[in-house]
Amino acid sequence: MKKTAMIAALLLVPLVMGFAGGGKAGEGAKKAERLRLATGGNTGTYYAYGSAFGQIVQNKTGIPVIIQSTGASKANIQLIQAGEVEIALVQNDVMDYAYRGVDLFNGEKITDFQTVAALYAEACQVVADPSKGITTIADLKGKNVSVGDAGSGVEFNANQILAGYGIGPNDFNRQNLSFGASADALRDGKIDAFFCVAGAPTTAVMDLAINKTVTLLEIDNAHADAIIAQYPFYTKLAIPGNSYRGNPNDVQTLVIKATLIASPKVDADTIYTLTKTLFDNKAEITAAHVKGAELEAGYAVSGISVPFHPGAEKYFKEIGALK
């Protein structure tokens, strides 16, 4: 069931009417009276990050931001298409699938959304129970492994990474659980490992590691390079040591980008102001959530295959990040 939480419900009409940022709204766009933000499960980074920046955006602009807990990237794109939310957090690879109508969106091409900004790196985290004899991803063959919600972007990431290690869909016992449910299942011995694609550290994994010994599995250079050659939306990144209890060393993995998208029906002024507010208030967002430290204009516009919303494009051109 989708959870909805209103953040500070009062709408200050003078502030909304006085939104900063020039430019005319695009055809069919209307002035936003609220922004409904689709995030992810309430133990994931999308929900925590979205709640943090949503509060700050509302405080600075006066427009209500309504945080929705959802099934994450695929569901969020569908929610924008259906007009049920105005903005959403999604993986940049899932955006690409939707816009081209491939893989996760095979036969279901969706182009009714636009990019606002890439925000931070999402790490493909493979969390395992070392007592089950698992020290590498190759050891997942024959194990009970949760690969995220069925049909989710996480499941596609898991399939791609496992295939890179020669593990096919029938070579392990597949479980489709959310991050929180996966952590509970590993704690209870019902699964041996799970995939979690989110900004690290992730709440579900942090909570699990408090009372359960877990190992974060590495994606070594040889396997990472081979996977990147096939799926160029990935890049390599090390998860810092001590992100989770009992894991003192840096662990290399693959990452994609958590990206903010918007409905083209939202006017350019609103999205301009949203984008500007995000980057003008990086310090406050970082104080509220550690991933805010990754807000950077050059990063925000790179590796993106879906056109930018006119409001976001205006902002990035003003600061020289886009030409």
Predicted regions and their residues:
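Short, low-complexity disordered leader/linker segments with a strong preference
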Residues: 1-34
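Hydrophobic/proline-rich hinge and linker segments of small-molecule sensing/allosteric domains
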Residues: 18, 114-135, 261-262
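N-terminal (or domain-start) structured segment
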Residues: 27-97, 106
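Bilobed "Venus flytrap"/periplasmic-binding protein-like clamshell domains
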Residues: 32-60, 64-65, 122-188, 302, ...
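Pocket-lining segment of extracytoplasmic ligand-binding domains
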Residues: 92-94, 102-104, 132, 168-260, ...
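A structural signal for short loop-to-beta-strand junctions that line the ligand-binding cleft
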Residues: 106-119, 124, 243-252
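Short helix-loop capping/hinge motifs at secondary-structure junctions, enriched
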Residues: 130-137, 266-269, 322
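An extracytoplasmic/periplasmic, membrane-proximal ligand-sensing/linker region
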Residues: 177, 181, 188, 198-216, ...
